[in-house]
Structure formats: structure tokens, C-alpha cells
């Protein structure tokens, strides 16, 4: 009954009272434009999707993140949700999220109940327009990481997002030497989670707060 109540509430919040870009602001660096603003002048937009995988374990709900391997690229070593760009073979972007989740961490495509889609996030540095889909599993699914794409699978308690003590600020240095200061991040699974992933988590956090 508790599980059914949680699912009903979160689906209702996503479908009827999605916080939107206002929820992104808390975890946005000062220099970052809102996605809707940045999209006005964007070119060569690349459609993509991520999977927010929720599951029940014992008496709590957990969520999955992945850490990318170190490589020469804009997202080297970053913590993110399973996901990627849309393939021509994908029927839609939900299918993209399910496929990427299977390819990266081994969750079978047909598994997981779709709870809804959160607000799009545009990533100017890569041109990706990310659509975040929320999936729920009644138990921890079998996880098989693709070593080429995933250095580590991370798990955290979903309701920990409500703890203000998990938010801090750091300095980020990109591969090209650019340094960004006062970047907000979530400290989850002993990792600094910032950027687009933090924006998505910030909206999820507000959804959880609104469910009270």
C-alpha cells in the first residue's frame, strides 16, 4: 500500500505540477542560461534522453547514477544518469532512454514502469537536448555495467535529496583549461554531482518536497 501511494503521488506531481525550470535555478551556475533561453539561439540540437531509475529496496526508494570513464571529451569522468542520443532505430525518446539504460547498465528494455517525464535540459557544450524519463522497479534490477561507458554504478537513497546539507559549491576545470567557480553540486554516493544531472535532480527534489 505504501508503495502504491508513493507511485500515485509521484505520477500525479509529474503530470500535474511539474516544477519546471524554476527548480533548475538552485543548482545552476551563475553563468548558465535557462534551457528555454539558450535554445533560442541553439543550432544543431541533438535529441537525447536519460533514465532516472528508481527501485525499492527494503523500506526505501533508491536511485541509480553512473560515473563515466576518463577520456578526452566534454563529459569525461562525470556522474550522470544512464542515457544518450536518439538513434534512428528508436521509436521515440522513451525508447532511447530504455535502450541506453540497457546498453550502459544492463537493465532490460521492457522492465520498469514509466512514471513520467521531467523538464528538458539543454547542454550547450555538447548540443544535447536531454529529456529525463522516470522509471520505477519494485526491486533492484540486475545491473551489468558496460565497462566502455561506465566506470562505476552509484546508488543513493532518493529522499536524501531533501537534505540541504548535501548541496555545496566547488570549482570545475574543463579539459580546455576553462575554470568555473562556485558551481553548485549534490554530494551523493561520495561524488560531486553537478551540471545537467544536478539540474534534473533539483527538479526531482522539489517533486519530493511537494509530495509531503
Task: Name every feature range the model reports, one short phrase each.
Residues 1-80, 85-103, 107-115, 122-140, ...:
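N-terminal leader/linker segments that precede catalytic domains of diphosphate-processing enzymes
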Amino acid at each position: 500500500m505504501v508503495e502504491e501511494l508513493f507511485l500515485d503521488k509521484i505520477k500525479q506531481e509529474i503530470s500535474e505540477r511539474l516544477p519546471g525550470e524554476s527548480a533548475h535555478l538552485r543548482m545552476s551556475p551563475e553563468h548558465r542560461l535557462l534551457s528555454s533561453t539558450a535554445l533560442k539561439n541553439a543550432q544543431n540540437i541533438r535529441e537525447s534522453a536519460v533514465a532516472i531509475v528508481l527501485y525499492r529496496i527494503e523500506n526505501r526508494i533508491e536511485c541509480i547514477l553512473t560515473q563515466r570513464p576518463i577520456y578526452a571529451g566534454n563529459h569525461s569522468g562525470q556522474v550522470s544518469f544512464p542515457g544518450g542520443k536518439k538513434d534512428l532505430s528508436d521509436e521515440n525518446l522513451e525508447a532511447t532512454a530504455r535502450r541506453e539504460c540497457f546498453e550502459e547498465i544492463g537493465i532490460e528494455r521492457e522492465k520498469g514502469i514509466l512514471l513520467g517525464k521531467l523538464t528538458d535540459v539543454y547542454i550547450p557544450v555538447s548540443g544535447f537536448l536531454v529529456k529525463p524519463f522516470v522509471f520505477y522497479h519494485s526491486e533492484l534490477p540486475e545491473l551489468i555495467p558496460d565497462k566502455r561507458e561506465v566506470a562505476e554504478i552509484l546508488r543513493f537513497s532518493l529522499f536524501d535529496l531533501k537534505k540541504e546539507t548535501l548541496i555545496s559549491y566547488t570549482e570545475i576545470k574543463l579539459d580546455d583549461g576553462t575554470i568555473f567557480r562556485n558551481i553548485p553540486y549534490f554530494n551523493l554516493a561520495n561524488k560531486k554531482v553537478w551540471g545537467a544531472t544536478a539540474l534534473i535532480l533539483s527538479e526531482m527534489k522539489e517533486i519530493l518536497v511537494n509530495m509531503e
